[in-house]
């Protein structure tokens, strides 16, 4: 039974509170555009911004962003703690803090919500995940996403900020499960990308995808996540959307590796830092320590280190002993 729930967004005539977005990258800008359709937005960014919708105020001062109750955190994981330490001085228990990270913080697979609660006084936190692309947010294309949070008011706030007739926002109380599902989907997309470019057919790609979800579920179960979460939007839904045709950087990285590029060149072609690469290494090592089978993560980690070609990687996966599904 699905654990994801949805209700209608706020009525068109209602005025919602100010929303803040931290981070002016592509996804942060897309969040700004989506939120600007429903009310006022303040964007904190260290880079200059242009061509933003009316009702958007850009600031370089985190204190100004803290005027909003709902804060959408779209800062890359490697900069997250320093930004959170600074903004945390201006936050308190009334704030709702929701991140969009697809990364894992350390070798014990801690998620971003752990950092949010450790570095700031916020306790009502959440994650926005699922097949929500820049296109869906920017152009109001039909789509759906999920907010993982133990607090219904967090889900309601995000739904009121970016939800609407074309974007359904579901809720899932399994916060850590949604975070893990989002992070692990990144490494599944890497594997699907190189399988596509090597020339394997739909059957192989389907096998890689479905067994990848099973691998993600094993990791999640070991960390207390609900198995059903991995069948929802944050994992299977995101994977299906990307496999149906996507410009996701993880897919592009997998394709570039399959073309014989060095890991460094492949990363540059795909758009620089991709969190799925570090996720693969951490998951592979975590599996070794815990005795959990992680064949996809193992292969991807070897490929990124240049120890395995894409074709040999897929063959290695397909040559594994089979058992019950």
Task: Describe these PLM feature segments.
Residues 2, 13, 189-193, 221-325:
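NAD(P)-dependent Rossmann-like dehydrogenase/reductase catalytic/cofactor-binding core
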Residues 22, 26, 30, 78, ...:
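Conserved active-site and cofactor/substrate-binding residues in soluble primary-metabolism enzymes
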Residues 28-32, 62-142, 158-160:
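Rossmann-like NAD(P)(H) cofactor-binding subdomain of soluble oxidoreductases
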Residues 99, 124-129, 169-173, 231-232, ...:
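General beta-strand structural signal in soluble alpha/beta enzymes
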């Amino acid at each position: 039974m699905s654990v994801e729930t949805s209700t209608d967004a706020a009525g068109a005539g209602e005025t919602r509170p100010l929303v803040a977005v931290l981070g002016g990258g592509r996804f942060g800008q897309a969040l700004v555009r989506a939120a600007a359709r429903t009310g006022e937005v303040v964007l904190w960014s260290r880079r200059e911004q242009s061509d933003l919708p009316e009702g958007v105020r850009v600031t370089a001062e985190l204190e100004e962003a803290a005027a909003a109750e709902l804060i959408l955190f779209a800062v890359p994981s490697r900069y997250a703690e320093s930004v959170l330490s600074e903004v945390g001085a201006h936050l308190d228990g009334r704030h709702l803090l929701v991140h969009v990270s697809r990364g894992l913080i350390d070798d014990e697979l801690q998620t971003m919500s752990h950092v949010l609660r450790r570095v700031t006084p916020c306790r009502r936190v959440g994650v926005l995940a699922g097949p929500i692309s820049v296109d869906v947010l920017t152009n109001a294309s039909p789509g759906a996403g999920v907010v993982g949070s133990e607090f219904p008011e967090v889900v309601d706030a995000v739904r009121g900020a970016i939800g609407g007739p074309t974007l359904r926002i579901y809720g899932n109380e399994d916060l850590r499960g949604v975070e893990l599902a989002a992070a692990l989907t990144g490494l599944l997309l890497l594997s699907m990308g190189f399988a596509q470019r090597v020339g394997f057919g739909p059957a192989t790609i389907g096998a890689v995808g479905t067994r990848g979800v099973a691998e993600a579920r094993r990791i999640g179960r070991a960390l207390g996540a609900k198995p059903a979460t991995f069948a929802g939007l944050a994992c299977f839904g995101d994977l299906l959307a990307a496999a149906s045709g996507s410009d996701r950087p993880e897919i592009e990285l997998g394709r570039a590796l399959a073309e014989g590029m060095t890991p460094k060149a492949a990363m540059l072609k795909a758009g620089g830092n991709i969190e799925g690469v570090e996720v693969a290494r951490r998951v592979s090592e975590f599996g070794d320590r815990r005795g959990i089978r992680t064949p996809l993560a193992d292969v991807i980690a070897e490929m990124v280190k240049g120890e395995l070609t894409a074709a040999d990687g897929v063959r290695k996966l397909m040559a594994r002993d089979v058992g019950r599904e």
